[in-house]
Amino acid sequence: MKQSAAKQTLKITAINGVVRALGMLLRILLSRLLGAEIMGIAELSQSVHMLAITPLTSGLPLAVSRMTAKARPEDRTKPLLAGIWLVRAAALVLVPLMLLFSPQLARLTGDVRVLPSLWCSAPCILILGYSAVYNGYLYGVERSLLPAFSELVEQLFRLAICAGLLLALPHLTAPWAAAVPVFSTMTAEVLGL
């Protein structure tokens, strides 16, 4: 059993290393394709994006994982279903609030050009919430390689979509070019589910 856990840990670590390397490659590519000014806009929106997804991605996977692991085999899907319900209910409130207050959030960042990025961030609340719940469930049923592979697939899609859009649409305005990384994250998460 210990050898199996060690092998699984090594596999997850290796996959995570590849995911991080792809992320570094993406950031280098973005800085070259977008330039400093647009990267600055993207970074401002990233801060708001991270804050927006925190309610559904911080503690929820751990809670679902623990509840799933402790549940009887016939009840193991109950935490998953409860988590999905919670994500839907929270997203029903948070997504409209994000869209409604995105102009004020953009002004708060000091650069209204983050607005398209914030619009793309709103659906991420629901999508990343689902992803968090499913990952927690998979950890709870001890299938931790699936979330790792899912993350790898997401990162590959994120890189391909981001690079593809920026190369295919070279004349995007600064606000919309800065929204491409957020859009690619949203799309890659859907594909990774």
Go through each PLM region and give its residues.
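Transmembrane-helix boundary and interhelical linker motifs in polytopic inner-membrane proteins
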Residues: 3, 34, 38, 52-86, ...
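Signature of the first transmembrane helix
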Residues: 4-62, 91-99, 124-125, 159
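Residue-level recognition of transmembrane alpha-helices
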Residues: 12, 16, 43-46, 87, ...
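Helix-loop interface residues and adjacent transmembrane-helix termini in multi-pass membrane transporters
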Residues: 33-36, 108-111, 140-141, 171, ...
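Short membrane-interface helical motifs at transmembrane helix boundaries
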Residues: 68, 93-113
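Alpha-helical transmembrane segments of multi-pass membrane proteins
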Residues: 100, 111-134
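Membrane-interface junctions at transmembrane-helix termini in multi-pass inner-membrane proteins
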Residues: 128-150
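Hydrophobic alpha-helical transmembrane segments
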Residues: 150-164, 172-193
